[in-house]
């Protein structure tokens, strides 16, 4: 990251690591706590530097409004875009790679990470918007509360995962939508493809 100052590099690396671990970006307060900034103004100063250099976008009025726009020069690897996820009413899954995103998969903690494009607003309360690209880390064993990409009857959807004994719920993050509920008999038609590892928003 030759074009970034030392502090900007530290801020950017923390944003990437935090997003990879949690599936959403850190708040300014979390940046301050992690990097020892005494004032939010210091964090905002370095975030503005990253924004001016095209690394991030910061949405006003949002607690977690940081969006990564690019990775450092020289970062290797690209994330395959394998189709679209329906956030709301699922659409037919596209199995072949449609495109790639110029983002290093290593930032998301998985060499097998792939991306999908969101359609709809059923995850809007999780700050996932129509047109966003969600990075998925493959796993078949999600934890309750994880946001997962699930294949249901050959269609892909993005939802919160919750399992209670022999019952699985795929829950939206929008009060206008109802959860999908499945019993053990339905499991043959429900397959978790992976958990959300990050989000990319193009502007």
UniProtKB/Swiss-Prot annotation:
A GO MF label: serine-type endopeptidase activity
A Pfam family (short name) is LexA_DNA_bind
Enzyme Commission number, as recorded: 3.4.21.88
Q: Mind listing the GO biological process terms from this record? A: DNA repair; DNA replication; negative regulation of DNA-templated transcription; proteolysis; SOS response
Per the database entry, where does the chain bind DNA?
A: 28-48
Q: How does it assemble?
A: Homodimer.
What's the protein here called? Answer: LexA repressor
């Amino acid at each position: 990251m030759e074009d970034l100052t030392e502090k900007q590099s530290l801020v950017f690396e923390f944003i990437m690591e935090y997003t990879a671990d949690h599936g959403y970006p850190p708040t300014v307060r979390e940046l301050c706590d992690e990097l020892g900034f005494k004032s939010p103004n210091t964090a905002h100063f370095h975030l503005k530097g990253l924004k001016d250099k095209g690394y991030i976008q910061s949405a006003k009025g949002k607690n977690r409004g940081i969006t990564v726009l690019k990775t450092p020069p020289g970062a290797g690897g690209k994330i395959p875009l394998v189709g679209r996820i329906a956030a709301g009413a699922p659409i037919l899954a596209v199995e072949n790679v449609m495109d790639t995103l110029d983002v290093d998969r290593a930032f998301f903690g998985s060499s097998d990470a792939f991306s999908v494009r969101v359609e709809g607003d059923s995850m809007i309360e999780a700050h996932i918007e129509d047109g966003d690209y969600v990075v998925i880390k493959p796993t078949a064993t999600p934890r309750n509360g994880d946001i997962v990409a699930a294949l249901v009857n050959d269609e892909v959807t993005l939802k919160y995962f919750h399992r209670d004994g022999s019952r699985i719920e795929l829950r939206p993050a929008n009060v206008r939508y109802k959860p999908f509920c499945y019993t053990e008999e339905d499991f043959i038609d429900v397959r978790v493809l992976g958990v959300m590892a990050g989000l990319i928003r193009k502007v």
